[in-house]
Amino acid sequence: QPMGWQTPIIVLCAHLNLLENDRERQYEVIQDYISKEIDADTPLILAGDFNDWKKMSSRKLGEKLHLQEALFTHHGKLLPTFPARLPLLSLDRIYVRNLQVKRAWVNTGYPWSSLSDHLPISAEVCPLPNS
C-alpha cells in the first residue's frame, strides 16, 4: 500500500507466449483470475510483455475487465517497444483499473536499449478522485 493511500494496489506481471493460440488461453486465465480473485473496486495494475502483435489484449482483457492501457490513455496511441534498438512494434502494456494515469512513457536510449530485447515502459498513477 503506497504511503498516504487509503487502499492497497494489486500489481500483476505477465509475459504471454508468442503463439496466438497460447495467448488466447492465457487471456482467459488472466481474465478468470482477475474476475474471481480481485474485487472490482480494488486498484489494479496488470503489466508486462503481452507479445501483442495484433493489438488484441485491449479487447480481450481491457474491455472485459474495465482496464485502461496507460500509454494509450496518456498518448492516444500505443508506443513501440520492440525491438529495443529500433522499436517498431507495440508488444508491451501497462493496464490499470481504478487508478488515474498521470504520465506514461517508454524508457529509451542507453542503458534501456541494451538491457533487453524490449524497451521498458513506465507509468505514474494516482488514486482516482474521491478514492
Question: Positions of the model-derived regions?
Answer:
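Active-site regions of metal-assisted phosphoester/phosphodiester hydrolases
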Residues: 1-131
